[in-house]
Amino acid sequence: MEGTCSEEENLAKRVTPTAVTSGTYGTHVVDTTDLALSDVVIGCGSTIYETSDSIGSDVMLGLSSHGVSSVSGLDRDLNSFKKRIDANTEEQREHADMMVGLQRKIEEYRRRIVDAEKQVSIQKANDDVSFSIKETADTWLPDMKSDAADYEWASRLDEERRRNDELHMQITQQQVDLQRLQKYFEANMQEKEKIYQTREKNLAYYLNAEQRKMLDLWEELQRVRRQFADYKEQTERDLENQKNEVAKVTQSVGGMAGRLNTSSHGDSGLVQDVVLLEAMRRFRELQAVPVGASADDYNALMKKYEETVERVIELESHGDGSTAKMLSLEAELRRTKDKFIECSEFLRKLGDLAAGSYRGDERTSKIVSLSPGGMSLPSEIYRSVRNILRNHDSEMQHIQRKLKNSDTQVCELTTRLEGTEEARRRSDKQLVDAKREINIQQRAVDDANRELRRVEDRLHIMESEKIVAENARQQLEEEVRRLTLQVDQSKADGERRVVEEGEIQKRIVEDEYRSMISELTRRMNAFQDENKRLKNDLGCTKERLKNVEFEYNSTVRKLEDKDIALKHLEDTKLDLLKDLENQRTRYDAVTNELDTLQTTFETSTKNIAQLEANIKEINLMRDEISKEKDSLAQKLADVTHKLEIETVRREDIQRSCVGHSEDVEKQRLQIIEYEREVMALRRLNDELDTNVKTGQAKVTSLENSIISVQTEVTKLTTLNDKLQKEKQSIMSSKQKADTDVDLLKEKLRKLEQECDKLKEENKALHEDEQIARQMCKEEASRIHLLERDLKDAMTEVEELKKQLQKMDEENSERLESVLRTKISSDTVDTSEIAEYTEVKVKELREKYKADLERLQSNKDDLERRVQILEDELAERQRIVERQRTEMNDLKLEYQLESDRLRAEMATVELKYQSEVEDERDQRSRDADSWKVTSEELRSKISFMEKMLEEAKHRETVLREEATEWEEKHDIISNESLKLRNEIERIRSDAEEDIQKWKKDVHMAQNELKNLERVCETLRSQLTAANDRVASLNTTINEQTSKIRELNSHEHRLEEDLADSRATSSAIENDLGNATGRLRSSEEHNAILQSENRKSKTEIEALKHQIDTIMNTKESCESEVERLKKKIVQTTTITKEQNEKIEKLRIEHDHLERDYREKTKEVDRLKEVEKTFELKVNRARQELDEFSKKLIVTETERNAISGEAQKLDKEVQLVKEQLQYKSDEFHKALDELANAHRISEEGRVNAIHQLEARRFEIDDLKSRLENSEQRLATLQQEYVNADKERGALNDAMRRFQATISRSVVAEEHVDVSTIETQMQKLMSRIEAIERERNEYRDSLNRLKNRCSTSYSSVDRQETVYRTFEERVISAEDERRKVELKLSSMKEMLKSQEEKLKQRDEERRNLKSNIVTFELEARAKDAQIRHLNDLLKRVQAELENSQNDNRALRERQEQYETNRIHLEQRLPTDEGEPRVKALMAAFATERQSLSDSLKKLASQLQISETKNADLRDDAERLKRDLLKAERVEEDLRRNLVEQTEIMRENQQLRSQLGVAQSDLANASGRKQQLEGELAAVRAELRDHKQHLHDAISRIAELQRQLQDANAEKSRLTDRIIGLEKTIGTLRNTETELRAQLSTAADERKALNSELEEMRRRIVQMESEKKDVDNQLEEVNKARIIMTKKIEILETEKHSAELVISETASQREAIERSLNALERENKELYKNCAQLQQQIAQLEMDNGERLIALTTKQKEDHEKFVAAVKAEKVQVERIVENRDRAQKSRIRQLENQLSMMREQLDNERARSHQMSERFIVNETNRRVSSSSFRLSGDAAGVAAATILHPQTDRLDYVFANRSALSSYYTVPTEQHASRGKEAYRTSSTIKSSEGTTRESYTYQSRTVSSNIIEQANGMTSSASGEGMSRAYPPTEVNQGDVTGRKSRPATRKQQMKSTFSE
């Protein structure tokens, strides 16, 4: 019955823990109340035992020892089953956690893919907004026509738009990240709160249980003390009673012996028998009563002792191990046991003595019945009794000592209790600290929520600001419309006013012209009167001459004597002199009048010139203002058009933003489901962001390169504009550049400091890495030492095994020897003794086998530890290998970056070469312009030569037609009237134009002011927006830093948890040690119990010994169970350690990835530093170049000013020379009268000199002609050189362009040809200078000769002197021209030097352009000056030719007269000859006087006319010069104003850009600081992890020490076993005597042994099941790890595909940006060509008056041609756009195909993984379902298992499906007798969200992935649920945005859904 009862109880205990319910994976409770125990039949008065953690003190014992053993066995079985069930539940929990983690990873991968595809879709949307790409139009027409000035606005608007888009994207991404982080943080906090709550509950429950146990133990100890005291007293009493009884027995024996001696033999025998029987009866009674009482007390004590032992074991499992004290207690118990045995032996000997004495009495009575005699007791008996008494006394003393020791132990236990209480207090403190940290984290969460709200408020504010900006835009449009209306009105008003003012001015000019004409007519009349008076005077002089002739005739007639003739001659001479004086006075008067006329004429010509200059200036102003007005109108139109475009784009963007916001709201539900995927996908996003940023940087670099290439095209047309703009802005830009350079230097200094800090941190990291490597090496050495120690331990274990084998052999031999001796001694009971011995031998063998199994289990534990250590070593080696691979990756990255930098340097060199080519092209164009100007000059020279020929012809005509002067005068007057009329008309037109231009300028200024105000408002708004964005960035950075701090705090908490787990594992090890020690103490106590029971009786002693043997067996079984529990615990510990290792791996991966990110960020910072350094170096170089160019410009300006001063000095010298000439002319006239007397004397010398001088003049003329020819040849050669230079430049430009297109340009082209030509020119100029010097020497000689022959100069010499003076003046002017030529040479040299400098510098176009423009202007001025000089030289040459002709004629006349005189002089024939001579002389004199008068009059007339003509020409020239100067001044003013406006605009834009750059830099700096803080925190965490690893190593060392201690303990235990073997040898002798009594109980023992064997078999079967389950779990873990690796590979492939697509898209975007910029630059080029054409037309100001209409027509034609070219260029651009679009479409199709392939592969892999998991779960469920039957099976059928997962909804419909992966749901989900199915809420929510999202927007890649995910989940659920739910279908009818997908895609989707 007892067996059946125990079996039923075992069944009940097995069935009760099977039904396990769990609401969550956090807590698992063993529900023992689910099954009613009433259903189970329990009989035989057996009780039900509750399954509690502590063993209660109310255990009911049976009536016999057999019942006690069965009850203890049931308790152990129950405990074992409970622990197994707990282990199974823990395994289920772990597997469920693993499944949840895997599902989280899968979801995170999916979410990352969705986010990446969203980013791609967002980039597509932005591309659609930013680029207006037409898909279908074949012909391309420009949407807007903008000038160069408007292009800047367009570029700025594009930049602002791009920035706005980027900010919008960043804000949306940050919002999504914030929401995602918030949700993830909330989920983590909820999980941690649950974990903390469960831990707190467990700790409170544990502490309460421990306190209860300690109190119970304390009570039990007190009870034990009392029992020991009672036992002591009872033993003392028993010993005293025994002493008394022994004394009485001895006395009675002595009395009986005396009586026997005295009495008779028969009576004595009877009496003796009776007395002996009575004595024996009394002795037995006295002995039985106390022994029976002690046996009952002993049983009670043993029960309580067992309870105390168990509780002490539990206490020691929680407290510190006190092995030494337990060993001392065991030794004391052994001593008491030995003493007890000795006492039992003593009592047995007494009994033997009594029996022997009784037998001896009988024998003596039989033998010596006849002989009377006495018998004395032997002395040995007395000695033995005395020894026993002495031993008893010593034992009593020893027991007293033990009591004292027990008191000390009680004190120690009290101290332990206090220690446990202190530990409890510490745990309470830790709990309080944990709660505080939880509160802090909750506060941080609240702060994060607040900040999120703030960010949302800021976003609302940004939206309101956007609305305000739109309103402002509308206002601007209205203002622009008003301005256009105002401009139109102002145009009409201005034109009307200008017409009116022109009419008024015309009238005024006409009045002035009439007044001038009246004045001129009056003056002409006066001149005619004077001419008439002079004629009358001439008539008088003629009459006087006639009278003189008559007188001369009368004198000839009357001369008879020479004296009378001579006197008469003298008188006539005197009369002639008087007449000459009168004529001189008259001539002086005439000259004065001529001077006055000349002054008046000069004033009039000056006024006319001024008027003409004013008219020209006004015309130029009119043209410029009209052009500016047109440009402004175009700008306004473009601005309005751009504003409209921007409004449309903003509306599109807003619509897209609204759509995105709706999509975001629709997809929030999906984001909630995919929250757990965020942590895994965030790293991917970060890597993708880094890739995107690197790609953006590459895009920006490529864009910069494209911009540079495009700027090369624009620079060809924008040179003149840039020159005019940058001429005056250099100084301001220099100052600003200085300030910018200072700021950049400060930034550089700060960046260098930061770089130094980063370098120091990098050094610290390297040092930490070295330290970590050293630690790893040390750990490796320690591990080697541990391995050696383990090997030593293994050898020691083997030696111990050998010793045990030897001991077994010795024991077997001893038993055989004992049995042999026993067989020889006892022949009666041989069979029984043999059987008994066999049983004992079997029992001993089983004991030894159990010990061997224990040792093997210890061996297995050590081997497992060794394996764990080896795994750790392998992991460390893997970590080292990973670090090496990472180092190699970093090296490769650095190499790639270096290659990229080299490529960038190559691109920069290409840019620089292209710039040099542009400069050369510009120079060639300038050379072409110079050629054109030189050709124009040649045409002008030819024209001037023609004019000279015409002037010569006119002079001849004037000489021949002297009578026609009056008619010519009338013609000239008419022409002057016409000119005046034209001048007045031009004035009126000019004034009208001026007024119009002023009005237009005023209106334009107002419009510009308004535009500037609008721009300022927009800039203020932009700055405010930038500030807000910066504030948002700062808040976001703060949020990220806080989140990182929270993450680091969480990591620290996790580390603390790991430490606490390690301590708990150490405590568990200590508990295991204590349990082993307590087991040994239990064994010793069982032995003591068996020895105490032997003291009752021999039979009871044998029974008690058997009970002790059974207890030892039970203890062995309990040890086996404990070992199994240890195995389970070790498995759990290994799993936990594996989990920890995995966590550490994950953390290590996190750290590695963070470290990579930080390295990448450091590299980026380095790149930024390099870029900043490059920018600073460029800025410095630009400043240096600007400074150099400023110096050059200043020097050139100084040179120009010096030249201007020289020209002024030359003009003054010319004036002085004219005055000097006039003075000399007067002096010459005076000297003619004085030198007339001397003329006859020096005629001969004069004739010779004249002939010589004539030859010299001819030589000079020839030389002059040669020099002119040489100049012409030089000019032609210069022009040819320029042409060749231009051709060479064009050829070089083309060659370099071809090279730059195909190959990188190598070196710059030398200008050797230009240098050679310049050298030729220099040599020719030197030759001309030599000739000039020769001319000067010859002129000096002529002057000297003239000074020597001054006395012999005649009247005609005065004319010659004037001619010489004119020649001298011409030579002076020629010298000036030569000086100017020398200056031109110097300028050419300077130009050559500048060209060389430009070739050397090659980096800054602006400075080169400025210098080039200045040089061109200087050359233009010099050319103009040379033209003026050439005109002057030509005029002087004409004058000199006229003079030469006059001199020749006069020379011929002089020679004829001389010949006549010579013929007349030698002959002296008397008075007739003298008279004839006198008459001839008189006639000659009259003819000479007549000719002189005629010549004088002609000279005066010609000089007056020439002077008038010269004055007119000079006045016209002056007026033209003034007009040109005024035009230049006006142009400069206008250009300066426009440049100032543009520079202001540029500076404002630059300031805005600089502010934005500063804001970006500050934001970036803050980000870097935050990242540095994060890096430092991560470094601290890394250090913390290192310290933890060190602590873990220390713990391992401690464990090794514990292992060594266990080793020593095992050795001590072996020693104790040897001692026990000795005691067993002693007991063997006793057992031989007891074998006869134990034979009866053999059958009961055999039955019990069979029961135990059956139980052992059951335990082994259960152990095999557990092992199978463990193997299955390991297989599942391996499968899941493989799946994770597959998913990681898929993720890597997806990342590669995404990166490739992103790179392709970036390339496409680059090409599109390049095309757009080319379009814009072409627009700029067209505008700049128009401006250059206008400037060229303005530069040709001299021909503007005559060629305005032609130029307008040419301009219109050119504009039409440019427009046609523009249309062609735009068509080309459109074609390129189409090609790019087609390529984009192809790439998008490829992307879609790749994505579809990826999705299909993912779906397939996911389906395969889910199928595999479902199969595994079904298999495991089917394997685990065989255990339950009966009512338990009904419970399992009633409780359907469901997985607690989020995505993989595995549902089982079979009632028998039970698995270790799943737990029983609550009553809400499951009911008894019914099947319940559960679909996760994630599928429903995802279905709803997908349907909603597909109704709005086009089908994107993310929707495809969601559809596939839904399909996969539905398919998985269908397979798990036997297709309980159909797959969800997407509503495709609502999809709008793109065309339907191809049929293949639909078929694939249908196939996936059907699968």
Curated annotation (Swiss-Prot):
It comes from the Eukaryota. Residues 1938-1948 have a biased composition (Basic residues). Residues 1865-1896, 1912-1955 are annotated as: Disordered. GO terms for biological process: cell division; meiotic cell cycle. Keywords: Cell cycle, Cell division, Centromere, Chromosome, Coiled coil, Cytoplasm, Cytoskeleton, Kinetochore, Meiosis, Mitosis. PANTHER family: CENTROSOMAL PROTEIN 2 (PTHR23159), CENTROSOME-ASSOCIATED PROTEIN CEP250 ISOFORM X1 (PTHR23159:SF31). May play a role in the organization of the spindle apparatus and its interaction with the centromeres. This is 227 kDa spindle- and centromere-associated protein.
